């Protein structure tokens, strides 16, 4: 029963992956060259915090930023003033400028604390310029933060749910400068990039496009790039691109792969994974540390001090691992059942999969993240 619960996540994945490959729209498989988002970043201040902001004595850049901002607003602070503020926090503001964004359009921003602020809940981001990689300002951000976490502390005890040092402002930035996008190459052709390189999928996309248009308007350059003969007129080109995006194509099934997350112990298999017949023996190794500090209490009339003497017992136990047969499995469900039969924990399973791969019994690419 425990083994079944342990593999519940993998079984759910199997249910999703067991069905045959279905046709997908080209817009879900590829994107046109030049149609991309651009990263923006800015530095600003969040005010209005309820005593949960930066400790300005430990984060001097917060106080320096506040002084500079006040001077721009006509407020001068005497030199040497030691401002003890807890309602202000220095933050980094990030956003993604969508393609074809026009002046005046709004976009969401993410606000993250830079200093030692406890929480940004209830704060307001002051006007912050957002710059691109070229240093130009493309948007201005300002607004009230939406924080998904909550925390409280009192008398040395604290509790926190989710993260309180970062939040979002829906529609918190306004586009001030547009990014010029050029659709197509100088020779009039238009490039289409597959999200994942695959020669079979590229061939199927080309065949679907040429079949729909009734002429060879598409040609595959390699496993990712498809070159299109697009109309020169802008309106006709948009119609051409929209027509291509809505065509259905059945993508090629990807290679067999096993993903292992060494930090969390998660193991994920896709539907192409198969096993060859092999024998597996794996012994579980457990280390137990039992710490029982002892208090040494001297005689009340003697000259001595009460001290705590550490006392720890360490034991190592290894369970014997008998050889177990793993039969040939050509179906993903058979693979899951064969691995479940070993009764191994996720951490042990990672070692078993690596050994099966080395022995040539695991017919899949093993990727550790």
Curated annotation (Swiss-Prot):
Summarize subunit and interaction data from the UniProt record for this chain. Answer: The basal body constitutes a major portion of the flagellar organelle and consists of four rings (L,P,S, and M) mounted on a central rod.
GO MF terms held by the record: structural molecule activity
Family membership noted in the UniProt record: Belongs to the FlgI family.
In its UniProt entry, what is this protein called? Flagellar P-ring protein
Chief site of localization: periplasm
General function of this protein: Assembles around the rod to form the L-ring and probably protects the motor/basal body from shearing forces during rotation.
What are the protein's UniProt keywords?
Bacterial flagellum, Periplasm, Signal
